[in-house]
Amino acid sequence: MTLFDRVFSGNDAVFGLTEGAIDGAIAQYGEDKAVSFPNTAYSLPCYYAVTGTKVTTLKELKEALGVVKTLMTREKRLNDAFMSGVATALCAEFIEVLKYIDGATPYEEPCYGHLADAVIRELGVPLVTGDIPGVAVILGSAPTVEEGVALVKSYQAQGILVTLVGGIIDQVAEAGMKTGANVRVIPLGKDVTAVIHVVSVALRAALIFGNVTPGDAGTLMKYTMDRVPAFVNAFKPLDDVIVACGAGAIALGFPVITNETENIFRVPKSLIVQEDVSKFNATSLEARDIKIKITNIDIPVAFASAFEGEIIRRKDMQVEFDGSRVDCAELVQTCDASEVEDHKITVVGPEVDDMELGSKNSIAYVVKVAGKNMQPDFEPVIERKFHNYINCIEGVYHTGQRDMQRIRISIDAFNAGFKIKHIGEVLYASVKNEFDAVVDKCEVVIYTDPAECTRVRHEVAIPIFDKRDERLDTLTDESVDVYYSCILCQAFSPSHVCVVTPERLGLCGAVSWLDAKATHQLDPNGPCQVITKERPIDENLGSYEDVDEAVQKFSQGALEHVTPVSYTHLTLPTILRV
């Protein structure tokens, strides 16, 4: 069977069940019997959101089923499969609403079933602010209780809202795990049709927060794809009904990750096979492009900007790593996503415990990063931040960069349990947090074995540094169309601005034209802004009207005219700094 056959088969099965259930309800209650979910102003929320029509009676529900039938085309195209998935979801909503006839309460603790509008509004704010970075829908039974609980807890620890459908509910109960809206783990129901209650959350969010007009299906699906960061984890075995439900999720922009390998068909970025359940979390976040802010770094000492100015004297030092005396290096490397294992920290060589008190040692750390928007030009920008990151560790001192850095670890930090691996934890968390726009995955390898440090420095790092320098050497002021401003120092010098050109660094000596360009790409509203050079006053002196205007703007009017070439030739008493 093809994927189309499985979706259509599952859709037909659910449609038949729905039709029978509605006919049975009409026979029992009559077609004028009211139907509704409790505590919602949106009638049947999913059907109303998709079609713009409210359903209030069994007669209208029967008519709505006819509308759903029109979505069930059988052309073997992805769009038809997805629409059949939507039809399956709407049928699931019809089956679920029948459970609530006469004000029945079909769900008992721990299951929630339908979620009231008030819950949607309560969840809406943290979803918008990013306090809830995503919504996980876990469907079926995990291979083991331990694996299922570990997956749920991994999402819970990241602040993700977790909804449970099917056997996973019994598994977390067996493990004694607490569930409920207050801990953001919500069991919906054990029937597969209960999955519609989380779909209802997404669609009502579009109506409530997105101002989407009911019935505007195109805008609705764009909103859920762009604004509702949900995804599905479906454990094997997957029957045709679950496959059809998965097609509906994909139509809304929610990727499905499964460990099923039998008779399953991959759809890039939408239907993803991940056989290792322990990797469901990382695969799901990557597929949905969810970035998790790391608020707690697992190290035994404090981490804060208050420690940036901390000096560690030799008498207070446990060990030192000194690039001026032994081989050291710090490097960022851009890799393919398949080459990076997120949050893997590896130490190759001795730990601090194995080093003599007060000794000088080698260290080289390579931070491997991967991301759809990552570029090699960003590497030195990230590297330059290592100084700040490591200096924020209580009891650790860092200075220098590239292959001339020096690090000291204090006796107090060592006694508190600080290890080399904790430098990796800090680098990982800081890079993922600050460069989340371009870094999706990050892995840190720290070498303390002297032979490995020598190899990394001379065979890996220095050739990369040389290539960067050679590239910059080929650029001239005349060969580029734009310069960049740099106002990083305005925190303590409010009218200070540098005009960074290929031939002229910022006066600090740390910001090259390529660095400024990368900084602007990473943070378009940040300290480095594009300065055009389209209206020349005197090209020999490098004088341009638009450069003058930019300098006047960024210096708060303290400087009105600048000629970059005069910085070298001193033909005018102006420089690039005020």
Q: Residues of each region from the PLM?
A:
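Cysteine-rich micro-motifs
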Residues: 504-510
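Short, flexible, mixed-charge glycine/proline-rich loop motifs
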Residues: 475-483
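Conserved small/polar residues in nucleotide/adenosyl-binding loops
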Residues: 568-574
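Acidic, serine/proline-rich low-complexity intrinsically disordered regions
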Residues: 2-386
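A broadly conserved sequence feature marking short terminus-proximal activation segments
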Residues: 424-476
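Short metal-coordination and nucleic-acid-contact micro-motifs, chiefly zinc-binding Cys/His arrays
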Residues: 482-485, 494, 504
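Short metal-binding segments enriched for Cys and/or His
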Residues: 514-523
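Cys/His-rich metal-chelating microdomains
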Residues: 489-495, 511-514
